[in-house]
């Protein structure tokens, strides 16, 4: 949703609104065809950042820096909760479910064992699925707002799940495992003819290196990577070492 709150030099009404879909389709107008085109193009890109922003439009184009005399447009990204699809209900999957719920994701947990896929074990999950990995992933609606992590009990189950998730347009796919093991899986699938570009999008080994050892710490490293990619972060420390001025 976009709306004008400072008209600037353009003959537009304050509060005029235009709805822009992720596809670029529009409903309504801000009152100026040129302004509509500029803002719509920027609004589509805002979906990728999942961010609400203010844009300033001048004769020279659009900027996010406050500019006196510009037409100011508020761009609000309205979308459903991102789906965090956890494949594997073990210790790491359980920790991920708790953390993803806390971070306001729609949490889905899949495991093929009843003892691991139940609401008593996963009370924070919005959906708990006990089914064959291949069948369940095939059925589940996956799109750019879906974040998938493979943390099953073994590399065989991870690879099976990865095969079904590839090429579905997920916003993120990650697979746990050592560098050696995951490299073997990727190489095997490459030799079988899977799209190299799709395989290159798989984050494996998964997570950010924070020295994680416990299931909770590993879950934190995985979620940190997801948030970094979702928000366009760098994972660099924001710590700044203060230095005393030289005497």
Model feature map: region roles:
Residues 152-155:
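N-terminal glycine-rich "phosphate-gripper" loop used for MgATP/nucleotide binding
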Residues 157-170:
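Rossmann-fold NAD(P) dinucleotide-binding segment
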Residues 170-171, 176-247:
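Adenosine-phosphate binding glycine-rich loop
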Residues 92, 157, 181:
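Hydrophobic/small residue at the entry helix of a nucleotide-binding pocket
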Residues 126-132:
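Conserved SAM-binding strand-loop segment of SAM-dependent methyltransferases
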Residues 114-116, 180:
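Helix N-cap at the beta1-alpha1 junction of Rossmann-like dinucleotide-binding domains, i.e.
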Residues 1-112, 120, 129, 140-147, ...:
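Segments forming oxygen-rich coordination pockets for charged ligands
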Residues 118-124, 186-191:
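Active-site-proximal loop->helix
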